[in-house]
Amino acid sequence: MLKFICYPKCTTCQRAKKWLDDNRIEYELRDIKLDNPTLEELTEWCNKSGLPIKKFFNTSGLLYKSLDLKNKLPGMSEDEMLKLLATDGMLVKRPLLIGDNFVLVGFKEVEWYEFVR
Protein backbone atom coordinates (compact mmCIF):
# COMPACT_ATOMS: atom_id res chain seq x y z
CA MET A 1 0.00 0.00 0.00
CA LEU A 2 1.15 3.53 -0.73
CA LYS A 3 2.31 5.75 2.12
CA PHE A 4 1.06 9.33 2.01
CA ILE A 5 3.10 11.52 4.31
CA CYS A 6 1.70 14.99 4.84
CA TYR A 7 0.98 17.87 7.15
CA PRO A 8 -2.84 18.09 7.33
CA LYS A 9 -2.89 21.90 7.59
CA CYS A 10 -0.83 22.30 4.39
CA THR A 11 -3.05 23.26 1.44
CA THR A 12 -0.86 21.37 -1.05
CA CYS A 13 -1.18 18.26 1.11
CA GLN A 14 -4.95 18.77 1.25
CA ARG A 15 -5.09 18.97 -2.56
CA ALA A 16 -2.96 15.83 -2.86
CA LYS A 17 -5.18 13.94 -0.40
CA LYS A 18 -8.29 15.00 -2.30
CA TRP A 19 -6.67 13.83 -5.55
CA LEU A 20 -5.86 10.43 -4.03
CA ASP A 21 -9.40 10.12 -2.65
CA ASP A 22 -11.05 11.29 -5.89
CA ASN A 23 -9.04 8.71 -7.83
CA ARG A 24 -9.89 5.99 -5.28
CA ILE A 25 -6.26 5.27 -4.56
CA GLU A 26 -5.67 3.46 -1.29
CA TYR A 27 -2.98 4.80 0.99
CA GLU A 28 -1.78 4.87 4.55
CA LEU A 29 -1.76 8.44 5.91
CA ARG A 30 1.00 9.68 8.18
CA ASP A 31 1.12 13.12 9.78
CA ILE A 32 4.70 14.32 9.36
CA LYS A 33 4.47 16.60 12.39
CA LEU A 34 3.30 13.84 14.74
CA ASP A 35 5.44 11.06 13.26
CA ASN A 36 8.71 12.55 12.04
CA PRO A 37 10.62 10.54 9.43
CA THR A 38 13.63 8.72 10.86
CA LEU A 39 17.17 9.02 9.58
CA GLU A 40 16.87 5.50 8.16
CA GLU A 41 13.63 6.32 6.33
CA LEU A 42 15.01 9.55 4.90
CA THR A 43 18.15 7.79 3.70
CA GLU A 44 16.07 5.08 2.02
CA TRP A 45 13.70 7.61 0.42
CA CYS A 46 16.55 9.73 -0.92
CA ASN A 47 18.20 6.67 -2.43
CA LYS A 48 14.93 5.35 -3.88
CA SER A 49 13.91 8.72 -5.34
CA GLY A 50 17.22 9.42 -7.06
CA LEU A 51 16.81 13.07 -6.01
CA PRO A 52 19.46 15.15 -4.29
CA ILE A 53 18.90 15.47 -0.55
CA LYS A 54 18.32 19.21 -0.91
CA LYS A 55 15.05 18.43 -2.75
CA PHE A 56 13.71 16.96 0.50
CA PHE A 57 13.91 20.30 2.34
CA ASN A 58 10.78 22.42 2.73
CA THR A 59 12.43 25.62 1.52
CA SER A 60 9.26 27.67 1.98
CA GLY A 61 8.83 26.65 5.61
CA LEU A 62 9.29 28.97 8.57
CA LEU A 63 11.74 26.62 10.29
CA TYR A 64 13.92 26.39 7.17
CA LYS A 65 14.04 30.17 7.00
CA SER A 66 14.57 30.75 10.72
CA LEU A 67 17.56 28.36 10.68
CA ASP A 68 19.00 30.21 7.65
CA LEU A 69 19.38 26.90 5.84
CA LYS A 70 19.57 28.58 2.45
CA ASN A 71 23.05 29.72 3.44
CA LYS A 72 24.02 26.75 5.63
CA LEU A 73 23.09 23.77 3.42
CA PRO A 74 25.79 24.36 0.79
CA GLY A 75 28.46 23.80 3.46
CA MET A 76 26.87 20.66 4.91
CA SER A 77 27.62 17.04 4.06
CA GLU A 78 24.84 14.70 2.91
CA ASP A 79 24.96 12.94 6.29
CA GLU A 80 24.57 16.25 8.11
CA MET A 81 21.62 17.20 5.90
CA LEU A 82 19.87 13.87 6.50
CA LYS A 83 20.42 14.10 10.26
CA LEU A 84 19.01 17.63 10.25
CA LEU A 85 15.92 16.53 8.27
CA ALA A 86 15.35 13.77 10.83
CA THR A 87 15.15 16.29 13.68
CA ASP A 88 11.84 17.88 12.64
CA GLY A 89 9.19 16.85 10.11
CA MET A 90 8.48 20.50 9.35
CA LEU A 91 11.85 20.69 7.59
CA VAL A 92 10.77 18.00 5.12
CA LYS A 93 9.10 18.95 1.84
CA ARG A 94 5.62 17.52 1.61
CA PRO A 95 3.57 15.73 0.67
CA LEU A 96 5.53 12.55 0.09
CA LEU A 97 4.03 9.61 -1.75
CA ILE A 98 5.96 6.41 -1.26
CA GLY A 99 5.47 3.19 -3.16
CA ASP A 100 7.49 0.01 -3.45
CA ASN A 101 9.65 1.38 -6.26
CA PHE A 102 9.28 5.16 -6.02
CA VAL A 103 9.26 8.22 -3.80
CA LEU A 104 7.52 11.38 -4.99
CA VAL A 105 8.33 14.67 -3.25
CA GLY A 106 5.78 17.48 -3.51
CA PHE A 107 2.48 17.22 -5.37
CA LYS A 108 2.54 17.30 -9.14
CA GLU A 109 -0.68 15.72 -10.39
CA VAL A 110 0.71 14.55 -13.74
CA GLU A 111 3.73 12.94 -12.10
CA TRP A 112 1.63 11.24 -9.43
CA TYR A 113 -0.78 9.94 -12.07
CA GLU A 114 2.10 8.33 -13.99
CA PHE A 115 3.29 6.45 -10.91
CA VAL A 116 0.00 5.28 -9.38
CA ARG A 117 -1.94 4.26 -12.49
Predicted segments, located by residue:
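Thiol/selenol-based redox catalytic cores and closely related redox-interacting motifs
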Residues: 34-117
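Local sequence-structure signature of Cys/Sec-based thiol-disulfide redox active-site neighborhoods
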Residues: 1-23, 27-32
